[in-house]
Curated annotation (Swiss-Prot):
Keyword Nucleotide-binding in record: no
Name the record gives this protein: Universal stress protein B
Family: Belongs to the universal stress protein B family.
One Pfam family per UniProt: UspB
Record lineage: Bacteria, Pseudomonadati, Pseudomonadota, Gammaproteobacteria, Enterobacterales
Alphabetical list of NCBIfam families matching this protein: PRK04960.1
Note from the entry: Overexpression of uspB causes cell death in stationary phase.
Record-level GO cellular component terms: plasma membrane
Species the sequence originates in: Escherichia coli (strain K12)
Length: 111
């Protein structure tokens, strides 16, 4: 029988790997954004996005831009594809993180 603790840690590893994939896709999206739409890149603080002095309110703008699917009217097809990918990965990573939290609570109650 599979240990529940081992299953929990496997779920944590899968969540961490998907987070890394999400951040990598977000970086690639910002590179494409810098080339195809410099004004939007500046609007979401693309240059300082992954730095300690980045502006969280501008970072949230990009998240809401993608969440609301406002990119669908953009002129660059590659940018639209990257936004779709980042959106799907964000939904997957959010669901996995939620599952990890629920699993942790269940593990604490069960053991």
């Amino acid at each position: 029988m599979i240990s529940t603790v081992a299953l929990f840690w496997a779920l944590c590893v899968v969540c961490i790997v998907n987070m890394a994939r999400y951040f990598s896709s977000l970086r690639a999206l910002l590179v494409v954004l810098r080339n195809c739409d410099p004004l939007l890149y500046q609007y979401v603080d693309g240059g300082g996005f992954f730095t300690s002095h980045g502006q969280p309110n501008k970072q949230v703008r990009l998240v809401w831009y993608i969440y609301a699917q406002r990119y669908r009217d953009h002129h660059d097809d590659e940018f639209i594809r990257r936004c779709e990918r980042v959106r799907r990965q964000f939904i997957l990573t959010s669901a996995l993180c939620g599952l990890v939290v629920v699993s942790l609570i269940a593990l604490m109650i069960w053991h």
